Curated annotation (Swiss-Prot):
Name by which UniProt lists this protein: Uncharacterized but2-like protein C27D7.11c
Keywords on record: Cytoplasm, Signal
Taxonomic path: Eukaryota, Fungi, Dikarya, Ascomycota, Taphrinomycotina
GO cellular component, as recorded: cytoplasm
Subcellular localization, as worded in the UniProt entry: Cytoplasm
Region listing for Disordered, in residue ranges: 174-200, 239-258
Species name: Schizosaccharomyces pombe (strain 972 / ATCC 24843) (Fission yeast)
Main location: cytoplasm
Amino acid sequence: MKFSSIPIASTLLSLLVASSVTASPLRRRDDPLNGRQFGLLALHSGNEYVHLHGFYVGDSGSVYLDPADGTDDAATFTMSNGQLSVGNRYASVSANGEIVFKSDTNSTSSGFSVGEAISSGYSLKYNGTESAVACPSLVNNQVYQVFFGVGNGNPSCVGIAVLAVLPQPISSSSTYNSTTSSYHNSTSTPPPTITSTKASTVTSTEATTVTTTTAVTVTATETYTVTATNGGSTITSTGASTVTSTQPSTVTSTQRKNTATTTKTTTYVGPSPSASSVVAYTTKCIVVPVITTAASQSEAATPSPSAAVYPLFPHGIRLIDSTKPEANSGNVYSPVVFQKQNNHTNTIFTFDVPQVSGSCELNFHLDTSGFPITVEGVNGTGRFILFNLSSVANDSTVYSNRPNRIAEIGRFNCSSSGCDYATNVTCPDSYTAVSYEMMALTDDSYLSFFEEADPLEGLTLRV
């Protein structure tokens, strides 16, 4: 499945931080990064080689999203008068947008600036735009190189947003302009330090023979811990991914012990997310199959289509507020749904759609294994409803011009323990985009959460 390469500047990115129920930026002093050290993160939902990867400056000065070119550590940057530097080397941007750090100051580029202030840092702009590009490097197509222009021509290049994150919490005495800010207030706390790695292990039983005349269910479970760390603070998220398939009656198979472990570390700099301050985390889930002998493989039933399809995560999440019909939330990281009498805060989710296989399913899942969720309602249960929309939300979508609703998709209840809901939907056309709206069904129903992949939390689409 190929994900869209549409740039996600200022998403996840303003996508990806929502500090309260709307994405209203904090007030900030001029040049907040001037003279301060910070890290840089690439943001692009759905690309495991790009999303939430730190910036590494190689020996040649080129910038990569993984260790490469003689460097093993994510770089620490400073910025002054529009010039971006690492140590005594300064960023120079070539005609095709390649960014290279050089000790020769004669070719230094001065077009870097601070974008929107968000609770975990600031978006980074070049020449007034946030449209950076990440492309597979010429040496290793799993290590991406950073460009602030057209890129190197590789068809797998993707647009990215660049997030500058300070190693300490951003101090601010400002309040959030939100109709429900009094409902949930946020406070800044020092970032914690947590260290671990991401490990995936699959083990099957040594020389075990199974014979049955009824249906046999085989389950593979991937347990994983994802850690993001770099100088400042660390995010750790743990969860599990399970694939289940049913084999036909009368099955005899022998399984061998086979253990495989992989480890991956992602760099993150900045304060730890909370229910009111989070960073976009929507990479692709990885499904690990059961390991069996050739004999058992020949008799195994074909897995169901849903088990073989990756979930799609929204590339855009927007809040619309009936009390501020012209307010533009921008793209946010944390969806919020709320109703108080006639006042609504709804969330619109937009997905990029690859090749459609035939049947489509919308899934909503929340539990307590990921970042904190907040659910309120009568007796602690909120009631919510989903709609499909007549058109796709865009950067100018607000409450007053929101797309029309075509029909109700379904209703679900949610509590502080979470919820799980799935429903078949009309498939969108291949290689297009589609939007869905979530709103509260009853008065005082409230829901906020963090869309993430490890563990899988939030709204996803399978096609």
